[in-house]
From Swiss-Prot:
The lineage of its organism: Eukaryota, Metazoa, Ecdysozoa, Arthropoda, Chelicerata. Transmembrane segments: none annotated. Belongs to the cationic peptide 04 (cupiennin) family. 01 subfamily. It is found in: Secreted. This is Short cationic peptide-1a.
Length: 28
């Protein structure tokens, strides 16, 4: 089903954003 595919893509993007946020926090 399409919605499941979209949800997976959104989750992947969120994880990427979250990782970037964590790295930025550690850099400070």
């Amino acid at each position: 089903f399409l919605a499941k595919k979209v949800a997976k893509t959104v989750a992947k993007q969120a994880a990427k954003q979250g990782a970037k946020y964590v790295v930025n926090k550690q850099m400070e």
